[in-house]
């Protein structure tokens, strides 16, 4: 694996339990978790680099897409911040030249019990289904990777009902 794409969300970041912790407009709640998101992404990068990865592209994929602090990431990384209004959305920058995808901070789908931050793409969607099944962002973005022939290597995700997700 020489070239890795990392898509990073925040709602599945360790310790998050409230929407305020995901919102830049509430800095006394948000700042800690934005730093935690950055630490988790940095850890994924360090592990990939130690395993021989030479090119790491990170897509900050939460809300404003300005959550990860690039200054706290290893020098050998590149980060896409903000939104390009591209159909790949949270996967912007991914193409068939990548050897793999890693997801950090992902979460369960809208309508899944057990996670107070469950949603799919935005809180306006009551649910999103693919072939009749509730589809979390992880599934939708894995399908984008699959369509390009890029395998998913790792997902750091909060799953409220693993058996339902694994039955996909």
How does the language model describe each region?
Residues 15-20, 40-96:
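Glycine-rich nucleotide/cofactor/substrate-binding loop typically near the N-terminus or early
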Residues 85, 122-148, 157:
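Active-site glycine-rich loop that binds ribose-phosphate moieties when present
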Residues 7-8, 59-60, 101-106, 155-156:
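Short beta-strand segments
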Residues 5-22, 33, 37:
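N-terminal glycine-rich anion-binding loops that anchor highly charged ligand groups
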Residues 161-168:
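Single conserved hydrophobic/aromatic residue that forms the stacking wall/gate
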Residues 18-32, 119-131:
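A solvent-exposed, charged loop/short amphipathic helix patch at secondary-structure junctions
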Residues 81-124:
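N-terminal glycine-rich phosphate/adenylate-binding segment common to multiple enzyme folds
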């Amino acid at each position: 694996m020489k070239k890795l794409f990392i898509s990073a969300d925040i709602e599945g970041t360790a310790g998050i339990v409230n929407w305020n912790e995901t919102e830049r407009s509430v800095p006394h709640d948000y700042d800690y978790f934005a730093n935690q998101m950055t630490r988790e992404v940095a850890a994924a990068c360090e592990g990939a680099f130690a395993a021989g990865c030479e090119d790491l592209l990170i897509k900050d994929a939460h809300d404003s897409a300005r959550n990860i602090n690039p200054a706290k990431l290893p020098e050998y990384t590149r980060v896409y911040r903000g939104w390009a209004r591209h159909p790949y959305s949270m996967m912007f920058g991914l193409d068939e030249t990548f050897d793999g995808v890693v997801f950090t901070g992902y979460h369960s789908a809208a309508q899944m019990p057990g996670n107070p931050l469950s949603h799919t793409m935005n809180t306006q969607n009551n649910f999103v289904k693919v072939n009749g099944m509730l589809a979390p962002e992880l599934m939708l973005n894995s399908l984008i990777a699959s369509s390009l022939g890029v395998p998913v290597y790792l997902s750091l995700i909060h799953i409220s009902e693993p058996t339902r997700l694994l039955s996909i």
